[in-house]
Swiss-Prot record:
Example of a GO biological process term: killing of cells of another organism
Stored SUPFAM superfamilies: Scorpion toxin-like
Annotated signal sequence range: 1-28
Compartments in which it is found: Secreted
Pfam families registered for this protein in UniProt: Gamma-thionin (PF00304)
Keyword Secreted: yes
Cystine pairs: C31-C74, C42-C62, C48-C68, C52-C70
Record protein name field: Defensin-like protein
SMART domains from the UniProt entry: Knot1
Length: 74
């Protein structure tokens, strides 16, 4: 019986340790704006993101008729 109580206590302690390690990550809204510096058809997100970073945004991606849209956290 004593062994069973010890196992139960150990399980609860282990559960408490793992539960305290869970971190909920929240993200803000992402705002998009069409790039003013990107010219031509947007085929690669990487190129779009580089141009957007030079414009002061955090990144960018190709979408909507192959146009480059810059992104940032609002």
């Amino acid at each position: 019986m004593e062994m069973r109580k010890s196992c139960g206590f150990f399980f609860l302690l282990l559960l408490l340790v793992f539960a305290s390690q869970v971190v909920v990550q929240t993200e803000g809204r992402v705002c998009e704006s069409q790039s003013h510096g990107f010219h031509g058809l947007c085929n690669r997100d990487h190129n779009c993101a580089l141009v957007c970073r030079n414009e002061g945004f955090s990144g960018g991606r190709c979408k909507r008729s192959r146009r480059c849209f810059c992104t940032r956290i609002c």
